[in-house]
């Protein structure tokens, strides 16, 4: 049996501890040995990132250099059109074959918006969803049919993620750090310290490049 792999996508503008630490805790909780961290090139739901694709990629390489859990995925950086998660996960499934257990990691805020995503209802055909819980967000979807969808696929057993190739939603009790890329960009613009918010080598690179000023 192939071991469970997970994909963790985002803009990472810049990458910070709020991205990395909850996923590291998640990996320990559910026995996950490989996470592909995949930056968007052209995010469909957000404005263009301030840092270039090459700069965001390099910051990720610095951040995960001493973390064997993480592998950098460049699939979406190689695409100049908007990166839709459903398309990315479908292509990943085709590469890995029908039996490999695959998961996509999102935050609880993203789960609540999930029905607005492009082809959201196909995503569980190709992967599991692992949701990092966040305090202050409701546990229920806003519409009854979406709540029914959540309950239909919900599992409380991490073993299901390893034993089945796709189709389950798991709510993980991970630590929530009050850190956001927006906060970091604002503090850097004001010249305030960000030493405790992101890896030192990433911060050094940001300063060398004059990013977010």
Curated annotation (Swiss-Prot):
Q: Report the EC number(s), separated by commas if there are several.
A: 2.7.7.18
GO BP: NAD biosynthetic process
Pathways per UniProt: Cofactor biosynthesis; NAD(+) biosynthesis; deamido-NAD(+) from nicotinate D-ribonucleotide: step 1/1
Q: What's in the keyword line of the UniProt record?
A: ATP-binding, NAD, Nucleotide-binding, Nucleotidyltransferase, Pyridine nucleotide biosynthesis, Transferase
Provide the top EC class: transferase
Concerning InterPro entries, the annotation shows: Cyt_trans-like, NadD/NMNAT, Rossmann-like_a/b/a_fold
Q: Transferase among the record's keywords?
A: yes
Q: Which domain of life is it from?
A: Bacteria
Question: What GO molecular functions are on record for this protein?
Answer: ATP binding; nicotinate-nucleotide adenylyltransferase activity
Tell me the Pfam families matching this sequence.
CTP_transf_like (PF01467)
Question: Which CDD domains does the UniProt record give?
Answer: NMNAT (cd02165)
Q: Which reaction does this enzyme catalyse, per its entry? A: nicotinate beta-D-ribonucleotide + ATP + H(+) = deamido-NAD(+) + diphosphate
Family per similarity comment: Belongs to the NadD family.
What this protein is reported to do is described as: Catalyzes the reversible adenylation of nicotinate mononucleotide (NaMN) to nicotinic acid adenine dinucleotide (NaAD).
Name recorded for this polypeptide = Nicotinate-nucleotide adenylyltransferase
- Tell me the organism: Salmonella typhi
Gene behind this protein: nadD
């Amino acid at each position: 049996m192939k071991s469970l792999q997970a994909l963790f996508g985002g803009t990472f503008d810049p990458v910070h501890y709020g991205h990395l630490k909850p996923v590291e805790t998640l990996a320990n909780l559910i026995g996950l040995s490989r996470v592909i961290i995949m930056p968007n090139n052209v995010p469909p739901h957000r404005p263009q990132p301030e840092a270039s694709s090459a700069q965001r990629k390099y910051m990720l390489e610095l951040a995960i250099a001493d973390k064997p859990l993480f592998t950098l995925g460049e699939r979406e950086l190689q695409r100049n059109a908007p990166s839709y998660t459903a398309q990315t996960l479908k292509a990943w499934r085709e590469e890995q074959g029908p039996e490999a257990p695959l998961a996509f990691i999102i935050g609880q805020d993203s789960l609540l918006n999930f029905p607005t995503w492009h082809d959201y209802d196909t995503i569980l055909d190709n992967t599991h969803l692992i949701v990092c819980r966040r305090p202050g967000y409701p546990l229920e979807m806003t519409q009854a049919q979406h709540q029914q969808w959540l309950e239909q696929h919900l599992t409380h057993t991490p073993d299901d993620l390893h034993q089945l190739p796709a189709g389950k939603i798991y709510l993980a009790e991970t630590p929530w750090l009050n850190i956001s890329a927006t906060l970091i960009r604002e503090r850097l613009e004001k010249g305030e310290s960000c030493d405790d918010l992101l890896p030192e080598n990433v911060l050094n690179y940001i300063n060398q490049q004059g990013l977010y000023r």
